[in-house]
Amino acid sequence: MREGTGNNFMSLQFAAKSENEAFARVAVAAFISRLDPTMDELSDLKTVVSEAVTNSIIHGYDSDPSGVVTIKVGIEADVITLVVEDAGRGIEDLELAKQPLYTSKPELERSGMGFTIMENFMDEFEAVSEPGGGTSVRMKKRIESKKALYN
């Protein structure tokens, strides 16, 4: 996702406020719209953006609006690469955090399904985190649209 590689890409940064989650979803959907994704593909992508951004806000920054969430999206042929990053508190036990129904904030009545949803809705999923060093979630999805073959 770098300039000059022939790929199309975008980068977006915003305050770690819950109201920005919808903005992030719409921005990513608008950017990938030229690939003419199906409604299911678009819904999947919007859902994973919501999950990743919400994780950054709630878990990474503990709902501190001074934090910054970064989204990077790259398009190469028919493949979308999506990266959501924060410089928050990081995840102590990433493997535990990836377990379905696990949540570090049970008082918020969250389902603990964010990573599971991201992993199941995307073709590739990788999370990297270090306690005190933030979290980066990188995902890829191939768009089935015929239009994607010509862009």
UniProtKB/Swiss-Prot annotation:
The gene it comes from is: spoIIAB
Say yes or no: keyword Transit peptide present: no
A single Gene Ontology MF term assigned here is: protein serine/threonine kinase activity
Return the InterPro entries for the record.
Anti-sigma-factor_SerPK, Anti-sigma_F, HATPase_C_sf
* A GO biological-process term: sporulation resulting in formation of a cellular spore
Organism of provenance: Paenibacillus polymyxa (Bacillus polymyxa)
Q: What is its EC number?
A: 2.7.11.1
Q: What UniProt keywords are attached to this protein's entry?
A: ATP-binding, Kinase, Nucleotide-binding, Serine/threonine-protein kinase, Sporulation, Transferase
Under which name does UniProt file this protein?
A: Anti-sigma F factor
